[in-house]
Protein backbone atom coordinates (compact mmCIF):
# COMPACT_ATOMS: atom_id res chain seq x y z
CA UNK A 1 0.00 0.00 0.00
CA UNK A 2 1.17 3.52 -0.79
CA UNK A 3 -0.31 6.97 -0.05
CA UNK A 4 1.13 10.18 -1.49
CA UNK A 5 0.76 13.78 -0.28
CA UNK A 6 2.95 16.61 -1.61
CA UNK A 7 6.57 15.44 -1.29
CA UNK A 8 5.71 12.58 1.09
CA UNK A 9 4.90 8.94 0.43
CA UNK A 10 3.58 6.68 3.18
CA UNK A 11 4.15 3.09 2.15
CA UNK A 12 4.53 -0.44 3.37
CA UNK A 13 8.00 -1.61 4.29
CA UNK A 14 10.37 -2.74 1.54
CA UNK A 15 13.15 -5.26 2.06
CA UNK A 16 15.70 -2.52 1.32
CA UNK A 17 14.43 -0.61 4.40
CA UNK A 18 15.97 -3.22 6.70
CA UNK A 19 19.46 -1.75 6.36
CA UNK A 20 18.10 1.73 7.13
CA UNK A 21 16.67 0.39 10.39
CA UNK A 22 19.97 -1.29 11.22
CA UNK A 23 21.75 2.04 10.72
CA UNK A 24 19.12 4.04 12.64
CA UNK A 25 19.26 1.75 15.67
CA UNK A 26 23.05 1.32 15.79
CA UNK A 27 25.03 4.25 14.37
CA UNK A 28 22.82 7.13 13.22
CA UNK A 29 20.90 7.49 16.46
CA UNK A 30 20.53 11.26 16.84
CA UNK A 31 16.75 10.90 16.37
CA UNK A 32 16.64 8.94 19.65
CA UNK A 33 17.40 12.18 21.50
CA UNK A 34 13.79 13.19 20.73
CA UNK A 35 11.82 9.93 20.80
CA UNK A 36 11.61 8.86 24.45
CA UNK A 37 15.33 9.50 25.15
CA UNK A 38 14.96 8.05 28.66
CA UNK A 39 14.53 4.60 27.10
CA UNK A 40 17.63 2.62 26.15
CA UNK A 41 17.38 1.61 22.49
CA UNK A 42 20.94 1.05 21.28
CA UNK A 43 21.59 -2.34 19.78
CA UNK A 44 24.00 -4.20 17.53
CA UNK A 45 23.69 -4.63 13.78
CA UNK A 46 23.08 -8.40 13.78
CA UNK A 47 20.27 -8.18 16.34
CA UNK A 48 18.58 -5.33 14.47
CA UNK A 49 18.95 -7.03 11.09
CA UNK A 50 17.33 -10.24 12.40
CA UNK A 51 14.55 -8.33 14.13
CA UNK A 52 13.67 -6.13 11.16
CA UNK A 53 13.92 -9.03 8.70
CA UNK A 54 11.45 -10.97 10.83
CA UNK A 55 9.13 -7.95 10.98
CA UNK A 56 9.36 -7.43 7.21
CA UNK A 57 8.55 -11.10 6.56
CA UNK A 58 5.46 -10.86 8.80
CA UNK A 59 4.14 -7.74 7.04
CA UNK A 60 4.97 -8.13 3.36
CA UNK A 61 1.89 -10.15 2.37
CA UNK A 62 -0.62 -7.87 4.10
CA UNK A 63 -3.74 -7.15 2.07
CA UNK A 64 -4.49 -3.52 1.19
CA UNK A 65 -7.84 -4.01 3.00
CA UNK A 66 -6.10 -4.27 6.39
CA UNK A 67 -5.85 -0.95 8.25
CA UNK A 68 -2.17 -0.27 8.82
CA UNK A 69 -0.73 0.62 12.22
CA UNK A 70 2.59 1.64 10.63
CA UNK A 71 3.88 3.14 7.40
CA UNK A 72 7.37 3.95 6.21
CA UNK A 73 7.95 7.58 5.20
CA UNK A 74 9.66 8.41 1.95
CA UNK A 75 10.59 11.93 0.84
CA UNK A 76 11.88 12.54 -2.68
CA UNK A 77 12.75 8.85 -3.01
CA UNK A 78 14.61 8.62 0.32
CA UNK A 79 13.39 6.45 3.20
CA UNK A 80 13.47 8.89 6.13
CA UNK A 81 11.53 7.26 8.98
CA UNK A 82 8.07 6.02 9.90
CA UNK A 83 4.66 6.87 11.33
CA UNK A 84 2.95 4.43 13.63
CA UNK A 85 -0.07 4.08 15.86
CA UNK A 86 -0.81 2.38 19.14
CA UNK A 87 -3.59 2.26 21.70
CA UNK A 88 -3.74 4.15 24.97
CA UNK A 89 -6.22 3.61 27.79
CA UNK A 90 -8.39 6.12 29.67
CA UNK A 91 -5.28 7.23 31.62
CA UNK A 92 -3.34 7.74 28.35
CA UNK A 93 -1.05 4.78 29.10
CA UNK A 94 0.00 2.38 26.33
CA UNK A 95 -2.16 -0.74 26.17
CA UNK A 96 -1.78 -3.86 24.05
CA UNK A 97 -4.64 -4.80 21.73
CA UNK A 98 -4.76 -8.12 23.62
CA UNK A 99 -5.31 -6.29 26.93
CA UNK A 100 -8.37 -4.34 25.75
CA UNK A 101 -11.53 -5.54 27.47
CA UNK A 102 -14.98 -5.55 25.85
CA UNK A 103 -16.47 -2.07 26.04
CA UNK A 104 -13.22 -0.48 27.25
CA UNK A 105 -12.58 3.02 25.87
CA UNK A 106 -9.21 3.22 24.17
CA UNK A 107 -7.57 6.01 22.20
CA UNK A 108 -5.95 5.64 18.78
CA UNK A 109 -2.58 7.32 19.30
CA UNK A 110 -0.05 8.16 16.60
CA UNK A 111 3.66 8.89 16.57
CA UNK A 112 6.40 9.69 14.12
CA UNK A 113 10.14 9.28 13.81
CA UNK A 114 12.15 11.14 11.20
CA UNK A 115 15.54 9.46 11.50
CA UNK A 116 17.36 11.31 8.74
CA UNK A 117 18.48 14.55 10.42
CA UNK A 118 19.10 16.30 7.08
CA UNK A 119 15.29 16.27 6.63
CA UNK A 120 14.50 17.94 9.97
CA UNK A 121 12.83 21.33 9.67
CA UNK A 122 11.60 20.75 6.11
CA UNK A 123 7.94 19.94 7.00
CA UNK A 124 8.26 16.26 6.09
CA UNK A 125 7.06 15.25 9.57
CA UNK A 126 4.07 17.58 9.44
CA UNK A 127 3.06 16.30 6.00
CA UNK A 128 3.56 12.66 7.00
CA UNK A 129 1.41 13.03 10.12
CA UNK A 130 -1.25 14.96 8.18
CA UNK A 131 -1.40 12.10 5.67
CA UNK A 132 -1.53 9.45 8.42
CA UNK A 133 -4.36 11.32 10.18
CA UNK A 134 -6.31 11.50 6.90
CA UNK A 135 -5.77 7.76 6.42
CA UNK A 136 -7.27 7.06 9.86
CA UNK A 137 -10.16 9.48 9.21
CA UNK A 138 -10.96 7.62 5.98
CA UNK A 139 -11.00 4.40 8.02
CA UNK A 140 -13.60 5.68 10.50
CA UNK A 141 -11.49 7.24 13.24
CA UNK A 142 -13.24 10.25 14.82
CA UNK A 143 -10.48 11.42 17.16
CA UNK A 144 -6.79 10.78 17.30
CA UNK A 145 -4.14 11.35 19.94
CA UNK A 146 -0.41 11.91 19.97
CA UNK A 147 2.07 11.92 22.83
CA UNK A 148 5.41 13.55 23.49
CA UNK A 149 7.39 15.15 26.29
CA UNK A 150 7.56 18.85 27.15
CA UNK A 151 11.18 19.09 25.96
CA UNK A 152 10.32 18.07 22.40
CA UNK A 153 9.37 21.55 21.22
CA UNK A 154 9.40 20.61 17.50
CA UNK A 155 6.84 17.83 18.02
CA UNK A 156 4.67 20.12 20.13
CA UNK A 157 4.70 22.70 17.30
CA UNK A 158 3.81 20.06 14.71
CA UNK A 159 0.90 18.82 16.86
CA UNK A 160 -0.42 22.35 17.33
CA UNK A 161 -0.01 23.15 13.62
CA UNK A 162 -2.15 20.10 12.80
CA UNK A 163 -4.87 21.26 15.22
CA UNK A 164 -4.14 19.00 18.20
CA UNK A 165 -4.92 20.38 21.65
CA UNK A 166 -3.25 19.30 24.86
CA UNK A 167 -5.63 17.07 26.83
CA UNK A 168 -3.36 15.58 29.49
CA UNK A 169 -0.13 16.54 31.23
CA UNK A 170 1.70 14.13 33.53
CA UNK A 171 3.91 16.27 35.75
CA UNK A 172 7.63 15.44 36.01
CA UNK A 173 7.23 12.24 34.05
CA UNK A 174 10.69 11.99 32.48
CA UNK A 175 14.31 12.93 33.15
CA UNK A 176 16.43 13.81 30.12
CA UNK A 177 20.04 15.00 30.32
CA UNK A 178 19.59 15.98 33.98
CA UNK A 179 16.37 17.96 33.45
CA UNK A 180 12.82 16.85 34.28
CA UNK A 181 9.98 17.08 31.78
CA UNK A 182 6.25 16.49 31.71
CA UNK A 183 4.58 13.81 29.60
CA UNK A 184 2.08 15.38 27.17
CA UNK A 185 -0.94 13.95 25.38
CA UNK A 186 -2.71 15.86 22.61
CA UNK A 187 -6.10 15.12 21.01
CA UNK A 188 -7.55 16.01 17.60
CA UNK A 189 -11.17 15.53 16.54
CA UNK A 190 -11.26 14.53 12.87
Indicate where each model-derived feature is located:
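Conserved catalytic-core motifs of GNAT/GCN5-like acyltransferases
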Residues: 145-148, 165-182
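PDZ/PDZ-like domain micro-motif
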Residues: 118-119, 174
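GNAT-family acyltransferases
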Residues: 1-117, 179-190
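Conserved acetyl-CoA-binding loop-helix of GNAT-fold acetyltransferases
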Residues: 121-135, 153-161
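Conserved beta-strand-loop-alpha-helix junction that forms the acyl-donor binding cleft
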Residues: 115, 146-156
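Amphipathic alpha-helical recognition patches that constitute DNA-binding helices
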Residues: 20, 109, 127-128, 143, ...
Amino acid sequence: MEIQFNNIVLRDMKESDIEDYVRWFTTEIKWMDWDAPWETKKSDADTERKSWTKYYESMREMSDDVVRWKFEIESEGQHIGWVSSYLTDENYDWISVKQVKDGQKVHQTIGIDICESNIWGKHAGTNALRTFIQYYAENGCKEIYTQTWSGNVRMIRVAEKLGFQECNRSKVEHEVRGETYDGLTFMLRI
